[in-house]
Design a protein with these regions (language model features):
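Short, structured secondary-structure elements
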Residues: 3-202
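Short, small-residue-biased leader/transition segments that mark boundaries at the very start
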Residues: 1-2, 163, 204-210, 214-216
Length: 222
């Protein structure tokens, strides 16, 4: 029973139901453990659970971040793409290629366009667009370079924008070579049809948020 609880929490992030625990305990046939794992891996909840780790790694958010933190109305297709990819057990090498350059590697697959959301999933400082002392495109590509390096090489690279990295083997020449890779990338919004039930979901979220907003307002007034 302990195994059933732990493996269910690990793979889909939810506890097993009472019926699932009873079914496992009463399953005396060989391969009971394997059947449980196979069913959990086939569950759509598996992708929802494990996609979170990738989305956290690349700093995905439904808003731009920074002080304005404006919403990204059409960020969700990339999130759904990652979930679906985990559920389909897509090989890692292909998963990476789809996110970095789906339009180049798979030009006959327009349905992979949401994968390119990887390049704009992180923080986007809108105020710097108007106030940066250098062309904003350079700062934007700097984010892409750091995103790629931290995700795939587990190291930072932004120091090398001005000088060779003091701790990691990233010289300035390598940094600007990576910037050149992303020089042709221009961020923009792609409009998607709203998902079924989105309005109802947002209404429910607003209902849940209202008490929190009230408490925050009362605390600030004290």
């Amino acid at each position: 029973m302990l195994f059933r609880s732990r493996v269910t929490l690990d793979l889909i992030g939810l506890p097993p139901t009472e019926g699932e625990i009873k079914a496992f305990v009463n399953d005396k046939k060989p391969g009971a453990y394997e059947r449980v794992v196979d069913r959990l891996l086939a569950s759509p909840r598996y992708g929802e659970r494990w996609a979170r780790h990738w989305l956290d790694t690349i700093h995905y958010a439904d808003s731009h971040g920074a002080e304005h933190d404006m919403g990204r109305k059409y960020a969700w297709p990339f999130r759904d793409y990652v979930i679906e990819t985990f559920n389909k057990d897509v090989p890692y090498a292909r998963f990476v290629r789809e996110q970095l350059a789906a339009d180049v590697f798979f030009p006959d697959r327009p349905d992979l366009t949401p994968a390119l959301g990887y390049l704009s999933a992180g923080n986007f400082d809108l105020s710097a667009y108007y106030t940066a002392p250098i062309p904003f495109e350079i700062l934007d590509r700097d984010d892409m370079v750091n995103q790629a390096m931290s995700t795939f090489v587990s190291t930072t690279a932004n120091c090398a924008r001005c000088h060779d990295h003091k701790f990691d083997p990233v010289p300035t020449t390598d940094y600007w070579s990576l910037q050149a890779v992303f020089a042709g990338v221009i961020k923009g919004d792609v409009t998607y049809e709203d998902r079924p039930g989105l309005a109802k979901s947002e209404e429910h979220t607003s209902e849940l948020q209202s008490p929190c907003n009230l408490v925050c307002r009362l605390l600030l007034e004290k």
